[in-house]
Amino acid sequence: NGNPTQKYPDASLGYQACENAYQGIFKEGRHGAGTGATIGKIYGPKQASPSALATYAVQLGDLKVGAIVAVNAIGNIYAPTSGTTLSGIRNLKDGGFIDAEEALYTAILGRDLFHQNTTIGAIITNAKLDKTALTKVAGMAHDGYARVIKPVHTTFDGDSIYAMSSSTIPADINVVGTIAAYVMEKAILKTVDFNESSGV
């Protein structure tokens, strides 16, 4: 429900979420699964950056592929081409960011951070794909995680992606999977835009 002071999700909140979805009520940012989400938690919450829930979609002819993701990762978010840190572990001394992969090598040995992290996303498409093909698409979409989150897929993360389809448009699985990785990457990068004006 977007209010971090209220109770954990239960059946009544799940029912309300379904009603909201049916009515077309949806908010990106620090709402729903984005509430309280943070990234760059290797040194703990004090140096983490706020994260969010975001979406991104493209259309190629009649084919539509979209992604939704809530980023709550132990790692940082990086620009895919330059490698610049966009958000993550804060350097409390100079206000910049600390490289998450370098921090991983020394900071978390012997610490249990598993329960604090998960990046969870979904791919939604109108491609005609069966369950096996959609599982493959979800796997290919993980490339989007790996392009912009580092470290990613660690044992401290519960990274997962699901895929679903209205199954109306004939499409090649390789095309759908490649686009899925792209839109997931873009959705993750979009969470940074919501973070800049938010506190943890």
Language-model features, listed with the residues they occupy:
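A structural signal for small-residue-enriched, beta-sheet-centric alpha/beta enzyme cores
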Residues: 1-200
